[in-house]
Amino acid sequence: MFGVYRVFVLLVFVSQLCNGFYLPGSYMHTYSDGDSIFAKVNSLTSIETELPFSYYSLPYCQPLEGIKKSAENLGELLMGDQIDNSAYRFRMRTNESLYLCTTSPLNEHEVKLLKQRTRELYQVNMILDNLPALRFAKQNGVTIQWTGYPVGYSPPNSNDDYIINHLKFKVLVHEYEGNVMEVIGTGEEGMGVISEADKKKALGYEIVGFEVVPCSVKYDAEKMTKLHMYDPVPSVNCPLELDKAQIIKEHERITFTYEVEFVKSETRWPSRWDAYLKMEGARVHWFSILNSLMVIFFLAGIVFVIFLRTVRRDLTKYEELDKEAQAQMNEELSGWKLVVGDVFREPEMSKLLCIMVGDGVRITGMAVVTIVFAALGFMSPASRGMLLTGMIILYLFLGIVAGYAGVRLWRTVKGTSEGWRSLSWSIACFFPGIAFVILTVLNFLLWSSNSTGAIPISLYFELLALWFCISVPLTLFGGFLGTRAEAIQFPVRTNQIPREIPERKYPSWLLVLGAGTLPFGTLFIELFFIFSSIWLGRFYYVFGFLLIVLLLLVVVCAEVSVVLTYMHLCVEDWRWWWKAFYASGSVALYVFAYSINYLVFDLQSLSGPVSAMLYIGYSLLMAIAIMLATGTIGFLTSFYFVHYLFSSVKID
């Protein structure tokens, strides 16, 4: 009992440590009074379509120097981010209201596009000093926080749409304190430490907050066209009357203006992301973890009782008998002892099993390392795309582990290393091939919609080059190491003639599929938060909780697979290899079913067949990765359990 308590205290400590250690993820910038700062704009996004589009696909004001794209990493490109410069200029600690531009009369295509983006709830995502714009809204007396602001709005009981053309910005600044320790991170500008000389020069203000209030204001277009960009205009209050708002219709000219207010804040630069990463539902996370711990300890208790009282008792009784008595006992008794000559017989499709286990080891390693680094703060949300980039890099370099695990299992099953090169190539191509097919199909859908989420052809070639130059050689090298590693020797000999398996009243696969409910019970609450982050545009930064859930999932998968394997051996079913894999891997089936449930009941606003196909495609890819990872955990645990179990049996 004391051991259980210590484990629980350790998990609490790890969670608090992971949540407390935070790296903001970018250089600290200080600005002097009057310094110009230009906002950037990311792709337009919507929770209704999940199809990102370029900001300048709509008739917005363009900067005087022209549109310039920011350098993007691999993760940003895959996520569909397209960060451009914008015309919105801010001057440090200068409160002002400025004119931007007036469009030409809207044509039919522009009106149709603006109305469509408005009704599909598209959001404009603006960034200042690497901080997304925050918007606060009240619903039923509760203040709700959003990132970005809508393209426009459609009043109820009206066929008209109105565009957001006036923005009221509030920029929170903190006076630079030279004695505050800076934090290293990885933002878009790179990585570095502020030197003492730079500290003395960097007298000024840090931007620690960026808020926006969107408005729709009807202007006299003829009068406003006489102004130039950044000319001052009177400050306005957001009108509530529709006749004072800017309607979207043909031949209308839309004037864009904005105003900015700088406000001093006590928030310091290392804490400026706290407003975005407020932990919601912490009690729900802890309830999920405690519930999972109860399941784990209950299941572990059953496992230990079975093994200590049944397995050890049988082994002790078996070893105390002489050879004649053992032979007589084998004829009289049934159970796992009777399959001693078949338990290590080569399974069907053994090559496919080795391939899936090899790739499963790689995916598991990638997930564990990524979540550990994220929990420690090395993959900050300030560094857009770094999480996905890190996962891809880890996957590529862990090819050496995949090749080693797959080939060593192949050598164990076959008794020879012959064919290891073909197996290593298959491991290198298996999951990337599945991902390539799914992403290519989805990419055609994105291309047909002119979405920025479509993967460019150049990126396809870059990914192919990374795979061929890093993943394939490392997988082959890992396979070579697997051929040189000491072979795992089976403790018993395999009979030439397979033993007949007794008929069962119900299919054994039914029990295997049902076993996935226990790992899913550990995972499903965290799945809700992850899905909400991906599909509803919310920040997910509770990696401390996710790390604990991952560790619990590993334990549950191992326990479930071992119990199912033992149950099959007890009924003289020696074909345990694939069943051990799918006993824990079947959790992927429930994850995919949950994703469909989430689509139907939580993403009711998702519209159009393209959006639904994108959602299902990405969910399917995630489920396959989960199946390979959890199946591998269960299989390897069962393999070592069976090896240990039968190594205790004395056989001539």
From Swiss-Prot:
Keywords: Endosome, Golgi apparatus, Membrane, Signal, Transmembrane, Transmembrane helix. It is a multi-pass membrane protein. PANTHER family: TRANSMEMBRANE 9 SUPERFAMILY MEMBER 12, TRANSMEMBRANE 9 SUPERFAMILY PROTEIN. The chain crosses the membrane at residues 287-307, 363-383, 387-407, 427-447, 461-481, 511-531, 542-562, 581-601, 614-634. A motif (Endoplasmic reticulum export signal) lies at residues 641-646. Residues 308-362, 408-426, 482-510, 563-580, 635-652 are cytoplasmic. It is found in: Endosome membrane; Golgi apparatus membrane. Residues 21-286, 384-386, 448-460, 532-541, 602-613 are lumenal. This is Transmembrane 9 superfamily member 12. Belongs to the nonaspanin (TM9SF) (TC 9.A.2) family. The C-terminal KXD/E motif functions as a Golgi retention signal, certainly through the binding to the COP1 coatomer. Pfam families: EMP70. It comes from Arabidopsis thaliana. Residues 1-20 form the signal peptide. One of its GO terms (cellular component) is endosome. It comes from the Eukaryota. A motif (Golgi retention signal) lies at residues 650-652. InterPro entries: EMP70. Its main location: membrane.
